[in-house]
């Protein structure tokens, strides 16, 4: 028997559909989110789950390491009040706590990460600012994308293919 392919999808700011959800909203979701319906029909959904932290940044390393924020050390969220390089902001350090990327890679899986990371500061920097990979209006900067792929900033966390910068 061959081992299964796995796709893990993490999203921000969602909740389970409430029991009182009306028919119109359910119909809209089914019509406009067909890929989500496909994954729900063909995958595994966890109906009773809890986050390790109400803040998104500490929750991500908890999901990826299986450890509480007090163990992996990421307990705060960066933003306007605290930037990535603030001495009060602690990120997960490579090799400190293994992630599911490390475990799956060790088991022979090809591990890829796409989207918001917010587990460590992974942006490539130039002149003190993150290297942009697009102009914001849809124009992609291929050389910047390649720079992220070549740098492989999530490699030590067990993932490849990530292209920044963080939103």
Summary of predicted features, one role per range:
Residues 1-167:
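Formylglycine-dependent sulfatase
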């Amino acid at each position: 028997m061959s081992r299964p392919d796995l796709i893990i999808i993490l999203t921000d700011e969602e909740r389970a559909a409430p029991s009182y959800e009306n028919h119109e909203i359910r119909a809209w979701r089914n019509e406009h989110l067909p890929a989500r319906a496909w994954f729900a029909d063909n995958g595994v959904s966890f109906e009773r789950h809890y986050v390790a932290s109400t803040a998104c940044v500490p929750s991500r390393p908890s999901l990826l390491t299986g450890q509480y924020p007090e163990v992996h050390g990421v307990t705060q969220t960066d933003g306007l009040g605290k930037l990535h390089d603030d001495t009060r902001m602690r990120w997960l350090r490579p090799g400190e706590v293994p992630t599911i990327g490390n475990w799956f890679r060790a088991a022979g899986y090809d591990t890829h990460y796409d989207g918001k990371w917010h587990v460590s500061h992974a942006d490539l920097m130039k002149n003190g600012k993150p290297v942009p990979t697009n102009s914001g209006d849809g124009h992609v900067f291929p050389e910047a994308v390649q720079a992220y792929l070549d740098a492989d900033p999530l490699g030590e966390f067990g993932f490849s293919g990530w292209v920044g910068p963080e939103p």
